[in-house]
Amino acid sequence: MAALDLRAELDSLVLQLLGDLEELEGKRTVLNARVEEGWLSLAKARYAMGAKSVGPLQYASHMEPQVCLHASEAQEGLQKFKVVRAGVHAPEEVGPREAGLRRRKGPTKTPEPESSEAPQDPLNWFGILVPHSLRQAQASFRDGLQLAADIASLQNRIDWGRSQLRGLQEKLKQLEPGAA
């Protein structure tokens, strides 16, 4: 009876793994299409604005990321990756900025001007009226970044499923030495 339950669990795990692999293949195809679309739109923008108008010379001297990648623990110890806007703080970052005791009397520090919470849109580096193809390139790469995080999470789930599959196969071999 235990071997029968183990085989049923093994079958359901194989079906889940195959579904995840199919989803991974689809997301990789979409990611490749988004990246290709982004580079093509960037080439169109360079053609429209001129090769020297869209290039590294127009980048800001001080760049800040617009998005960050956060890894979090999901069920069964799996890591799940998520793309988060840079201005959004994680719950563990909320709180007092200085640790320790404060001196209430005495010399006061002048607060340092902090950068704005929301980073500036990088498209403004190339002028106010940028071509639509440059905005399309930015959107394509942004979608690609989200897809890359989804693919990384899915790949972790597939690796976890494969290790579970191997463990169940070993248990089945121990229960039925002549089978499997």
From Swiss-Prot:
Name the domain of life this protein comes from: Eukaryota
Q: Any keyword Protease?
A: no
One biological process term in Gene Ontology: lysosomal protein catabolic process
Q: Where in the cell is it found?
A: Endosome; Lysosome; Endoplasmic reticulum-Golgi intermediate compartment; Cytoplasmic vesicle, COPI-coated vesicle
Coiled-coil blocks: 16-37, 153-176
GO terms of molecular function: unfolded protein binding
Q: Where is the composition biased (Basic and acidic residues)?
A: 92-101
Tissue specificity comment? Expressed throughout the brain.
Main subcellular localization, coarse class? other
* One of the Pfam families matching this protein, by short name: Vma22_CCDC115
- Record's keyword annotation contains Transferase: no
Q: Which GO terms describe its cellular component?
A: COPI-coated vesicle; endoplasmic reticulum; endoplasmic reticulum-Golgi intermediate compartment; endosome; lysosome; membrane; vacuolar proton-transporting V-type ATPase complex
Provide the residue span(s) of the region labelled Disordered: 92-122
Q: Which UniProt keywords apply?
A: Coiled coil, Congenital disorder of glycosylation, Cytoplasmic vesicle, Disease variant, Endoplasmic reticulum, Endosome, Lysosome
Q: What PANTHER family is this protein classified in?
A: COILED-COIL DOMAIN-CONTAINING PROTEIN 115
Implicated disorder: Congenital disorder of glycosylation 2O: A form of congenital disorder of glycosylation, a genetically heterogeneous group of autosomal recessive, multisystem disorders caused by a defect in glycoprotein biosynthesis and characterized by under-glycosylated serum glycoproteins. Congenital disorders of glycosylation result in a wide variety of clinical features, such as defects in the nervous system development, psychomotor retardation, dysmorphic features, hypotonia, coagulation disorders, and immunodeficiency.
Q: What does this protein do?
A: Accessory component of the proton-transporting vacuolar (V)-ATPase protein pump involved in intracellular iron homeostasis. In aerobic conditions, required for intracellular iron homeostasis, thus triggering the activity of Fe(2+) prolyl hydroxylase (PHD) enzymes, and leading to HIF1A hydroxylation and subsequent proteasomal degradation. Necessary for endolysosomal acidification and lysosomal degradation. May be involved in Golgi homeostasis.
Quaternary structure, from the entry: Accessory component of the multisubunit proton-transporting vacuolar (V)-ATPase protein pump.
Question: What is this protein identified as?
Answer: Vacuolar ATPase assembly protein VMA22
The organism named in the record is Homo sapiens
Instruction: Identify the coding gene.
Output: VMA22
